[in-house]
């Protein structure tokens, strides 16, 4: 899956987030997960965790 910096993604667990750093292209990323209100959580994910790239 082609994922670029600042792409919006939907994870397989249905959480939405934005790619904020590409750790290893096509393998691992840091994303900011949207939380209720103005909060977010930054997590590391693998390419296999992504369900869909929204761009």
Provide a role label for each language-model segment.
Residues 2-55:
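Basic/aromatic-rich interaction segments and small domains that mediate binding to polyanionic partners
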């Amino acid at each position: 899956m082609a994922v670029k910096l600042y792409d919006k993604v939907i994870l397989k667990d249905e959480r939405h987030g934005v790619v904020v750093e590409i750790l290893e292209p096509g393998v691992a990323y840091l994303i900011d997960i949207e939380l209720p209100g103005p909060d977010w959580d930054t997590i590391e994910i693998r390419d296999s965790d992504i369900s869909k790239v929204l761009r």
